[in-house]
Each structure stands twice: as structure tokens, then as C-alpha cells.
């Protein structure tokens, strides 16, 4: 029975991924420049919430604190008319919570893509061969264990995508201190 449930979940996740894949594919038809933001530890200060006890996942995700300067950056992109996509490796059942969080904390005009794991982000980025992409993603994990680790395999593969400008962990730390009252 467990094997059947696991297999069913995997099939459902593949169907959902295909939906987001198609959504992403059609988005590429509209703009030449696309701005993509990860959410956890990029737009939202997520890792401290992982240390809190007695909080269910829905409540935890709903109460994340945004990084104020990154939100200002997003708002500047939005004012400039840029296409903004949020792409996060989160369970698909949190799609509506994630969408509400973005609307309440960042911007109203955006697209949201959820993937079941961080490696699927790379698959989606490869669709946009003829588009200029600015991709904000720390690509890190394990902060809550007092050691920050990185998805080195993805970081290396991103370097091969000439159309993708990756803004990573160190750059995001600098952006947190930058003033975004001026136009980009």
C-alpha cells in the first residue's frame, strides 16, 4: 500500500510539474527579458522559521518575513514593466498559501511556478534559450543546522546558460544593504 501511495504521489507530482512546464513555456512567448525570484532565503527570511517548534507548515509559510530591500527591488522591476516570476521548490499543496504570501508581501502582478525539487528549476530555465533571464536564487540550504551548504551541481550548470544572469547567495547579501529608492 505504501508503495502504491508513493507511486501515486510521484505520478501526481509529474503531472503538476508538466502543468508548470507548459505555463513556463507559454510565458516565454511574451517578453524578451524575464526576472525570476526564488522565495525561500531569497525573498523570504525562511531558515529562522525552521527552528521554531510547534508550528505547522501552512502557518510557518504564511508568517515568513520578507527581506525588505529585495521587496523594494521587486517593486522597481514591476514599475519598469518587467515580467516577474517567482519559482520555488515547495510542495504543490502550498501553491495558494505561497501565492497569497507574495501578494501580501511583495507584488500583485506576477507568475508563480512551484517545483518539487531545486533541480527542476534548471530544467525550466533551459526552456528560455532566447530570453534574457535574471535569476535571483541563493541556491543554499542547511542554514538551520549552522552550516550553509550550496547546490554546487546546479551552480556549475547555471554557468553554462549564457542567457541567465544568476544573482546568488553573496550578491543577495549585498543587495540586502543596498538602497532601492532609485530606479534600477
Predicted regions, residues:
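Short hydrophobic segments within beta-strands
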Residues: 38, 87, 135-136
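C-terminal cap/substrate-recognition subdomain and adjoining C-terminal extension
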Residues: 91-184
Amino acid at each position: 500500500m505504501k508503495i502504491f501511495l508513493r507511486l501515486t504521489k510521484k505520478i501526481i507530482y509529474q503531472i503538476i510539474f508538466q502543468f508548470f512546464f507548459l505555463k513556463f513555456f507559454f510565458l516565454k512567448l511574451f517578453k524578451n527579458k524575464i526576472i525570476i525570484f526564488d522565495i525561500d532565503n531569497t525573498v523570504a527570511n525562511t531558515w529562522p522559521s525552521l527552528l521554531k517548534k510547534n508550528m505547522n507548515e501552512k502557518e510557518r509559510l504564511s508568517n515568513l518575513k520578507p527581506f525588505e530591500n529585495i521587496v523594494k527591488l521587486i517593486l522597481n522591476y514591476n514599475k519598469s514593466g518587467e515580467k516577474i516570476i517567482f519559482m520555488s521548490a515547495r510542495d504543490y499543496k502550498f501553491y495558494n498559501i505561497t501565492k497569497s504570501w507574495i501578494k501580501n508581501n511583495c507584488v500583485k502582478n506576477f507568475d508563480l511556478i512551484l517545483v518539487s525539487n531545486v533541480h527542476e528549476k534548471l530544467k525550466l530555465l533551459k526552456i528560455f534559450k532566447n530570453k534574457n533571464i535574471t535569476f535571483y536564487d541563493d541556491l543554499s540550504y542547511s542554514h538551520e543546522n549552522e552550516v550553509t551548504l550550496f547546490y554546487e551541481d546546479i551552480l556549475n550548470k547555471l554557468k553554462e546558460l549564457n542567457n541567465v544572469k544568476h544573482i546568488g547567495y553573496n550578491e543577495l547579501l549585498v543587495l540586502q544593504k543596498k538602497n532601492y529608492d532609485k530606479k534600477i
